[in-house]
């Protein structure tokens, strides 16, 4: 089966059919050949099974896998590259380190799989990206959970993979450890040209890390597309969660040193956001996340108040939220998508309806790396 991607354009084509007594996976995915693709869904939706198929660890009754032009599986041609010959890195929920080896020896073990001439990630780069240079002489027993996971990720990178698979790498960590490790994962996203398939059931993780999103339900892909497009679809489950949010990319357009306020120009030209942050070069692209719970609506422009960001918006559609007392409202701010979660009482009091003009008051903006 030839690749379906245009000449010169990288991509991943993953088609798997897997049958178990009580579960089946049947997906046909066309994914970007770079950046982070998140597989999102409830437990039992098929996320890990899909990852195991990519790694060659699950029996596939019918399938095809092309990683940027390199075919690892083609059932029709009876071709299946064994797992140990697939240039992939696999990061599990808990790092499986060799307890009798120090961190440096664990990392060097990952490098042994790759001939020196084929290494695309070196030791200095991996330790720098994950911030573990000071841990090289430590034994695994002396590492925190977050440190162990960072070492495990670095070891996976040192195999110089063409594909990095990450199966809920933060699931075993407490909130503080997750906060510590997320910036390092964002650095991988920004600085390495390795496609990542990231399994998670955390909307916040997906919003911070992913470029592309695949939603799985009962072994089927119910939606696949750019993250910003799928996050605002009210017919999909992510918009119904307590952490429902949008991710917006803009450009730094000014800084007020007296108040430490950075201005972000949003796509479309007129809408801007301001938030407390350090200065950034003019024109630098930045990503921010805005949670639906932090957006309120008004019919008249608020003139006085403590909320910095008030944007003119158009109501696009509304849908019931997970909590029956609330509704989700999809908005357009001069081309920038937003979500608001408001009470049904507020909807009725404001008599909101599609195509109405309103004002969105954004209480909080979080900058992503």
Swiss-Prot record:
Membrane topology (UniProt): Peripheral membrane protein
Molecular function in Gene Ontology: ABC-type molybdate transporter activity; ATP binding; ATP hydrolysis activity
Any Pfam family the entry gives: ABC_tran
Keywords, alphabetical: ATP-binding, Cell inner membrane, Cell membrane, Membrane, Molybdenum, Nucleotide-binding, Translocase, Transport
Binding site for ATP: 41-48
Annotated SUPFAM superfamilies: MOP-like, P-loop containing nucleoside triphosphate hydrolases
GO cellular component, one term: plasma membrane
Residue ranges of every copy of the ABC transporter domain listed in the record: 7-243
Gene3D superfamilies: 2.40.50.100, P-loop containing nucleotide triphosphate hydrolases
PROSITE patterns to which the protein is assigned, alphabetical: ABC_TRANSPORTER_1 (PS00211), ABC_TRANSPORTER_2 (PS50893), MODC (PS51241), MOP (PS51866)
Catalytic EC class: translocase
Coiled coil: none
Annotated compartments: Cell inner membrane
UniProt key word Transport: yes
Start and end residues of each Mop domain: 304-369
E.C. number: 7.3.2.5
Known catalytic reactions: molybdate(out) + ATP + H2O = molybdate(in) + ADP + phosphate + H(+)
UniProt family annotation: Belongs to the ABC transporter superfamily. Molybdate importer (TC 3.A.1.8) family.
Assembly notes: The complex is composed of two ATP-binding proteins (ModC), two transmembrane proteins (ModB) and a solute-binding protein (ModA).
Role: Part of the ABC transporter complex ModABC involved in molybdenum import. Responsible for energy coupling to the transport system.
Name of this protein: Molybdenum import ATP-binding protein ModC
Lineage: Bacteria, Pseudomonadati, Pseudomonadota, Betaproteobacteria, Burkholderiales
